[in-house]
């Protein structure tokens, strides 16, 4: 017999769903007369990698802000998996108080476009801060975590933990932002334009790192779910995620990378205008010496 929720639980916005990490139901959001999100319905399953793409003003960032609870919808619901409950529960974010939201937030992390690192502070301090303030870990555990996650993003903990953020290259700063997110051992990892502003070779390295991080399970053995907000066509080619394309706040496409790539839609086709150059670079037709960029 399948589990049944009580009417009280249903009224609190709780629903059963064993494999779903995010469910968005009939989501609307307007700013003035501008409809930014216009009836979004989306389900993200545990372990998926999803890229949300679209032009400027399509609603990508607003959708991300709703998923992490920074914005409230005009209509509709955003439900996220509650990994601290018994069973497979999805909880409506709008029903949560601060304590309930904090409980959910322990299991996700966001890598922001601007990295959100504290300038003037060291790499080690930036990684330790959420471990100390949010998770309340002791200093010995924090020290071990710092070394572990810095190695995971291909930095040298003996050299790089003591560097200040203003001493880092763009690629190193992005690696530190990813390391800080990994330190929280997230089941859901969200990236907002993770390669914006990076040189092409460095962007390639960050894309490969994102793919590698996605393949690693959490400490509890759960598959990691990755959600990317991006306009980076190269990333789609390298990672081949499930693709959600937004246009004027609506989902224009939801499907595999291969279907997206071969679409004849006049809206989708421009995303592949630069693909031949990328293919040449990946196949080695560019001078290899030109690709030896520092990380």
Language-model features, listed with the residues they occupy:
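Helical segment within the ABC ATPase nucleotide-binding domain
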Residues: 204-221
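Catalytic Walker B motif of ABC-type/P-loop ATPase nucleotide-binding domains
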Residues: 189-192
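ABC ATPase NBD Q-loop/coupling interface
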Residues: 77-103
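Conserved ABC ATPase signature
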Residues: 164-168, 172
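Conserved catalytic motifs of ABC-family nucleotide-binding domains
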Residues: 185
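Conserved ABC ATPase "signature" region
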Residues: 140-159
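Helix-to-loop junction immediately C-terminal to a conserved catalytic motif
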Residues: 68
């Amino acid at each position: 017999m399948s589990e049944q929720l009580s009417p009280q639980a249903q009224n609190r916005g709780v629903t059963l769903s064993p494999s779903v990490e995010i469910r968005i139901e009939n989501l609307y959001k307007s700013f003035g007369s501008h409809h930014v999100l216009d009836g979004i319905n989306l389900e993200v399953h545990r372990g998926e990698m999803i890229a949300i793409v679209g032009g400027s003003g399509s609603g990508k960032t607003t959708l991300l802000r709703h998923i992490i609870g920074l914005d409230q919808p005009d209509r509709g619901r955003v439900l996220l998996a509650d990994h601290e409950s018994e069973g497979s529960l999805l909880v409506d974010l709008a029903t949560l108080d601060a304590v309930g939201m904090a409980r959910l937030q322990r299991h996700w992390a966001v890598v922001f476009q601007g990295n959100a690192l504290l300038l003037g502070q060291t790499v080690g301090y930036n990684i330790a801060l959420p471990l100390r303030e949010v998770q309340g870990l002791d200093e010995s555990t924090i020290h071990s975590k710092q070394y572990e996650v810095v190695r995971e993003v291909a930095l040298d903990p003996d050299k790089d933990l003591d560097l200040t953020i203003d001493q880092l290259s763009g690629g190193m700063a992005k690696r530190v932002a990813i390391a800080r997110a990994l330190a929280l051992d997230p089941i859901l990892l969200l990236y907002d334009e993770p390669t914006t502003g990076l040189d092409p070779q460095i962007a390639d390295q960050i894309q490969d790192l994102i793919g590698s991080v996605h393949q690693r399970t959490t400490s509890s053995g759960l598959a990691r779910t990755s959600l990317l907000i991006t306009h980076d066509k190269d990333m789609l080619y390298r990672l081949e995620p499930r693709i959600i394309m937004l246009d004027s706040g609506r989902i224009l496409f939801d499907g595999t990378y291969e279907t997206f790539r071969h679409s004849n839609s006049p809206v989708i086709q421009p995303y592949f205008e630069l693909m031949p150059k990328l293919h040449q670079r990946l196949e080695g037709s560019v001078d290899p010496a030109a690709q030896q960029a520092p990380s």
